[in-house]
Amino acid sequence: MSRLFERTAKGLVGQEQYRDIPHRSGSTDMGDVSQIMPSLHPYMGGAQGPGHAATFAIVDKQLGYVLPAKALAAMVVDLLADGAAGAREIVAKSKPPMTRAGYLTFQRSMARREVFDGASGG
């Protein structure tokens, strides 16, 4: 999927404007999704400031909103063309680290309920 996104993005913004971003720290729900199925969390420009900060702002609406939507729509077309051949190939080659059942078992094993009784100090 990353190669498909790269090809699509380069077609939209040009080779000279495309660049790979190295792995970034942080956590997203896409990390969870990627444990059970092929996934992609692409970034496109148009924003300034740290993510989730009060100073984060979209400064280029074309690059921040329109081009990402076009890229994703173009990828959907490519993935579903020819009877979804592209999507089927990605799924066939995918080797997710967990099954759905394994993921749910893991998540349920991590769940717990804690009650803090501030009145008792403990």
Segments and roles (model prediction):
Residues 18-75, 79-118:
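Zn-dependent metallopeptidase/amidohydrolase metal-coordination segment
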